[in-house]
């Protein structure tokens, strides 16, 4: 079998680092950008990182995020200026001209805000350590996906939240204050009730220093289990080869995501589960993939060791046809023999919401019924499960596409409401 070449810095075209000429340390925290469509999430990521994460051709054409976007950025600190003016993403302080020092590097996960892309948002939320809820000051609050995204953060258990009141340059002071009170009323009684509300303009770079100060306070670097076997949630996968490349030039497939525990090095063996679907004589099964790490990138920086926190691009010796077009998204990678089992069905304990959010009429949520199809998000995986048995607080589902998940894993549950998948609750895998 042909052993594909090691990957080069072409990997960094897919997991971006800041537009400045920095030598970044590995990101230590993943921060999600969530909120309603066109409220400025991608523009804010660009203001903080210099990277425009909408690079897919359809995203450029339609002007909205479709896939998860990623960008790394350093939070720099001026040794002379007081807080919050000391914070910037520049190498020199915009206030006094002093050379700044790197405080920490973060990864941003830019989730789409369109209602039809809720599954993508939920898979991104699985790798977030905290989140920025972006709310436009020039529209009434809350908008439908503002409500749905906040409910998703609450259900998944993301408690470290900063609220950004964006586009303050487009409205009057009176409208900003009115919108602020709408925001505070909206988050009352939710996981974001005590989150700070930072008024900014991502387009004009207004109050970015105050926002970074809030992110430093509200979303600390989490502690990670580096003494465990390496385990990685795959959020993207790529074929980085250009059309027409000769066999000698072909490079192995790339997986992108975040380490949840353990340490990863070039040369380490990896198992990927559930793996690839194989059909023989009318019988279908999923076979785990085994490969070796050829290179690791944190943004554009090649590293010899990767630890949990932040986003990584991992080069492998896999046939790139296995990784092209996000085909391994939702799978798990880790030390062979240590990953959770592949599940074609499971029983989950149910915790349903009272009402459907994100729709015009917030209807009461009825109990889950046998034979009902549900969209299920487990980690970065999205699959459809058909309910094979249902009781008041428990349901068994048969999956259209298997997942690798442990007992106790959390499941975000959505059902079809008015031809759209709507979040209705959360489950916990029991068996």
Curated annotation (Swiss-Prot):
Binding-site residues for Mg(2+) 2, renumbered to this chain: 38, 63
Alphabetically sorted, this entry's keywords are: GTP-binding, Hydrolase, Initiation factor, Magnesium, Metal-binding, Nucleotide-binding, Protein biosynthesis, Zinc
Region called G4, residue ranges: 166-169
Q: Could you tell me which residues belong to the region G1?
A: 35-42
What Gene Ontology molecular function terms does this protein carry? GTP binding; GTPase activity; metal ion binding; translation elongation factor activity; translation initiation factor activity; tRNA binding
What are the residue boundaries of the tr-type G domain, all occurrences included?
26-223
Q: Where does Mg(2+) 1 bind?
A: 42, 65
Per the UniProt entry, the Enzyme Commission number(s) are 3.6.5.3
Which parts of the sequence bind GTP?
38-43, 166-169, 201-203
Q: Which GO terms describe its cellular component?
A: cytosol
UniProt region (G5), positions on chain: 201-203
Q: What does this protein do?
A: eIF-2 functions in the early steps of protein synthesis by forming a ternary complex with GTP and initiator tRNA.
Q: Which family does it belong to?
A: Belongs to the TRAFAC class translation factor GTPase superfamily. Classic translation factor GTPase family. EIF2G subfamily.
Spell out the protein name for this chain. Answer: Translation initiation factor 2 subunit gamma
